[in-house]
From Swiss-Prot:
EC id: 2.3.2.27
Phylogenetic lineage: Eukaryota, Metazoa, Chordata, Craniata, Vertebrata
Region (Disordered): 73-141
Descriptive protein name: E3 ubiquitin-protein ligase RNF38
Species in which this protein is naturally found: Homo sapiens (Human)
Name of the top EC class for this enzyme: transferase
Length: 515
């Protein structure tokens, strides 16, 4: 005899999702025989369910709005099961021997009193844990309830783990608050049966709120282009996913099944070394190998060079931050061979490709490149000093008809040209350059006599050169200006100068006039 179970009038006001009521009824009916289908038993069951669910925490208002439906299970016309959410698969997955049948019920009647219909303590704790996990994760799947029912059934059929659709606005690092609730997934239940494709996100509570993504394929991150993720160790940004394509996705490098042994190094508390993930033997041949994982010691040795170079600017014109999305496909598109990124250092003429190159051969090559660049620089020319050769040549007493013709092309500035013209004007006023002193023949042609104090007619009584008085019988020399001097004193003066020591008159001109 088929048993028709209806929540009744009292169960319409029960809090929580209808799945809770159905699961509790099915579990109790599978463990104990059914009671006679009378009104008193139904009322007692409804009172028991109401008392059981009111003892737990009240769900959010959104869950209450979605729970206004009544399910009627019969053996003849079973209703389709509601869509199962990804986070409920772990809690509802049970062995076939324990899992109750949701479509067919036994025809036996229950003889157990209503007061003994209590769930075992272990099952109640598991139900409370599942409800808490679903209550914490309801803030992250706002867009999940808006999917059509047909799409939810299509998602449920493969029975594989599919993360909920996430809005593109949540992908930006600024949209993640520091205390964001993460989706709680029981990895032990998912992976105890073998190798299962699992995608998950580990959120680190960092000062900047940067998500730490694994090197595996994350479908929620593959809809928008975001710069690569990085881990913060002691204030230093170290890249985790070294992905060189021109349009970087948010760590969506590989899409491969990963065994459970690859995840503990990423979840462990060892802050000094990031272990590379183990490659599965089912790695697709058309995809590149996983991203390069460098130990922390190697990454830390690069930080002094970054502090010395003081601001390395990444040329990111070809890295858009959103707007373009890849079309949905079964496999991720094959990454084209991309050009390495270039870094602009302080030397604008010396750029090197430094993306993806390990650090030990990178630093000597960079230093040798800089030294080679410095050694190839040309020696700067000496500063220009204008020559005085034209001025000296203009002072030479060479007739223009006899002397050679000189042509000078002076590549000087305007100020130097003006100075040169001023020197030429001065040379024209002074005349031709003449020897400074007189020759010995010219000096001997000057008149001289012996001093006699008795017949001396000049008023000059001393030599201005030696400042001594004239004495008797001393040889005096008279210049054309009638100034008298000791012959020895004035001859020595005239050898270096051609003028009179007293009046500065030219002794040679006077001498020529007298001739």
């Amino acid at each position: 005899m088929a048993c028709k179970i209806s929540p009744g009038a009292n169960s319409a006001s029960l809090p929580g999702h209808p799945n809770k009521v159905i699961c509790e009824r099915v579990r109790l009916q599978s463990l104990f025989p059914l009671l006679p289908s009378d009104q008193n038993t139904t009322v007692q069951e409804d009172a028991h369910f109401k008392a059981f669910f009111q003892s737990e925490d009240s769900p959010s208002p959104k869950r209450q709005r979605l729970s206004h439906s009544v399910f009627d299970y019969t053996s003849a016309s079973p209703a389709p099961s509601p869509p199962m959410r990804p986070w409920e698969m772990t809690s509802n997955r049970q062995p076939p021997s324990v899992r109750p049948s949701q479509h067919h019920f036994s025809g036996e009647r229950c003889n157990t009193p209503a007061r003994n219909r209590r769930s075992p303590p272990v099952r109640r704790q598991r139900g409370r844990r599942d409800r808490l996990s679903r209550h914490n994760s309801i803030s992250q799947d706002e867009n999940y309830h808006h999917l059509p029912y047909a799409q939810q059934q299509a998602i449920e059929e493969p029975r594989a783990f599919h993360p909920p659709n996430v809005s593109p606005r949540l992908l930006h690092p600024a949209a993640h608050p520091p205390q964001q609730n993460a989706v709680m997934v029981d990895i032990h239940d998912q992976l105890h049966q073998g190798t299962v494709p699992v995608s998950y996100t580990v959120t680190t509570v960092a000062p900047h709120g940067i998500p730490l993504c694994t090197g595996q394929h994350i479908p929620a991150c593959s809809t928008q282009q975001v710069p690569g993720c990085s881990v913060v160790f002691s204030g230093q940004h170290l890249p985790v996913c070294s992905v060189p394509p021109p349009m970087l996705q948010a760590c969506s490098v590989q899409h491969l099944p990963v065994p459970y042994a690859a995840f503990p190094p990423l979840i462990s508390s060892d802050p000094f070394l990031i272990h590379p993930p183990h490659l599965s033997p089912h790695h697709p041949p058309h995809l590149p190998p996983p991203g390069q994982f460098v130990p922390f010691q190697t990454q830390q040795s690069r930080s002094p060079l970054q502090r010395i170079e003081n601001e390395v600017e990444l040329l990111g014109e070809h890295l858009p931050v959103g707007g373009f999305t890849y079309p949905p496909s079964a496999h991720p598109p094959t990454l084209p061979p991309s050009a390495p990124l270039q870094f602009l250092t302080h030397d604008p003429l010396h750029q090197e490709v430094s993306f993806g190159v390990p650090y030990p051969p990178f630093m000597p090559r960079r230093l040798t490149g800089r030294s080679r660049y410095r050694s190839q620089q040309p020696i700067p020319p000496p500063p220009y000093h204008p020559s005085l050769l034209p001025y000296v040549l203009s002072m030479l007493p060479v007739p223009p008809a006899v002397g050679p013709t000189f042509s000078f092309e002076l590549d000087v500035e305007d100020g130097e040209v003006e100075n040169y013209e001023a020197l030429l004007n001065l040379a024209e006023r002074l005349g031709e350059a003449k020897p400074r002193g007189l020759t010995k023949a010219d000096i001997e042609q000057l008149p001289s006599y012996r001093f006699n104090p008795n017949n001396h007619q000049s008023e000059q009584t001393l030599c201005v050169v030696c400042m001594c008085d004239f004495e008797s019988r001393q040889l005096l020399r008279v210049l054309p200006c009638n100034h008298e001097f000791h012959a020895k004193c004035v001859d020595k003066w005239l050898k270096a100068n051609r003028t009179c020591p007293i009046c500065r008159a030219d002794a040679s001109e006077v001498h020529r006039d007298s001739e």
